[in-house]
Amino acid sequence: MANTPSAKKRAKQAEKRRSHNASLRSMVRTYIKNVVKAIDAKDAEKAQAAYVLAVPVIDRMADKGIIHKNKAARHKGRLNGHIKALKEAAAA
């Protein structure tokens, strides 16, 4: 437990940041989940629309350091790959 006033303040700030960051991470996961649901439903239009909404959110969280930039790029690349495969399957 923190003893000095400054340590108590830092602990309080850390807890506040932790809960805020957890909320932001949850939001990113929700956007990703919406894209995945549309892909699983084989709905290319809905998946593309959800992807367009998810990309700026993923990028913003990467810029803020909530998720690593490489993780953000990996998510975007994989989701986009799945959507492209879905469109190609629908076209074929």
Curated annotation (Swiss-Prot):
Please list the GO terms describing molecular function: small ribosomal subunit rRNA binding; structural constituent of ribosome
Query: Which NCBIfam families does the record cross-reference, listed alphabetically?
Result: S20
Q: Does the keyword RNA-binding apply?
A: yes
Stated family: Belongs to the bacterial ribosomal protein bS20 family.
Q: What is this protein called?
A: Small ribosomal subunit protein bS20
Q: What does this protein do?
A: Binds directly to 16S ribosomal RNA.
Pfam families listed in its UniProt record: Ribosomal_S20p
Gene Ontology cellular component terms for the protein in this record? cytosol; small ribosomal subunit
The record's keywords, sorted A to Z, are: Ribonucleoprotein, Ribosomal protein, RNA-binding, rRNA-binding
Q: Where is the composition biased (Basic residues)?
A: 7-20
User: Which segments carry the region annotation Disordered?
Assistant: 1-23
**Superkingdom per UniProt:** Bacteria
GO BP field: translation
